[in-house]
């Protein structure tokens, strides 16, 4: 077997055993955090669904749309390492910054809160410190497109967004598209 054939076989073996999730093989990740079962907490899911309809197939080759739900964003972020292709993460979530319900706030990495926590589980784990760590350790640009929630029904199930937050979905999509397309 010549050297060219050996190299080709090794390359195929590497691909077979590459366990990197597909969303970490793209330059940009739009990470939706939320749960449609809890009223306005489902904001990000609606944003991701609209982006999925609007983005072209060519754009989707470099942009990963990840609906991580309420508990999985931390797991998604902890999989990032030096082999990840991700250069930018746009997190979409509801926020509580004391602004008007439905108002959109863009939060840069340096503005992320730094909460102290003692208990560690996937529902109470603050995302901001992990976002900051990933951004700094792997030189990834991070932004949060946050929408001030009006009503989060948890633990009660309520499917549907408040009127204010529903109106904010299109605005968030426009902001994200400008960020993705460089408009």
UniProtKB/Swiss-Prot annotation:
One of its GO terms (biological process) is protein processing. Keywords: Aspartyl protease, Hydrolase, Protease. It comes from the Archaea. One of its GO terms (molecular function) is endopeptidase activity. It holds the Pfam family HycI. Belongs to the peptidase A31 family. PANTHER family: HYDROGENASE 1 MATURATION PROTEASE (PTHR30302), HYDROGENASE 2 MATURATION PROTEASE (PTHR30302:SF1). This is Coenzyme F420 hydrogenase subunit delta. It comes from Methanocaldococcus jannaschii (strain ATCC 43067 / DSM 2661 / JAL-1 / JCM 10045 / NBRC 100440).
């Amino acid at each position: 077997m010549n050297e060219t054939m050996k190299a080709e076989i090794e390359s195929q073996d590497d691909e077979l055993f590459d366990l990197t999730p597909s969303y970490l093989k793209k330059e940009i990740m739009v990470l939706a955090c939320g749960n449609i079962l809890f009223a306005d907490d489902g904001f990000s899911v609606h944003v991701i669904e609209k982006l999925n309809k609007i983005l072209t197939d060519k754009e989707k080759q470099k942009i990963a749309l990840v609906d991580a739900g309420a508990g999985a964003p931390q797991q998604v972020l902890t999989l990032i390492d030096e082999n990840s292709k991700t250069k930018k993460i746009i997190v979409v979530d509801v926020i509580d910054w004391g602004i008007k319900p439905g108002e959109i706030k863009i939060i840069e990495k340096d503005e992320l809160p730094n909460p102290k926590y003692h208990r560690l589980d996937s529902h109470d784990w603050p995302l901001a410190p992990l976002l900051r760590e990933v951004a700094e350790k792997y030189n990834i640009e991070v932004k949060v497109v946050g929408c001030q929630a009006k009503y989060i029904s948890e633990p009660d199930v309520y499917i549907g967004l408040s009127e204010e937050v529903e109106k904010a979905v299109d605005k968030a999509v426009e902001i994200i598209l400008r960020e993705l397309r460089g408009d």
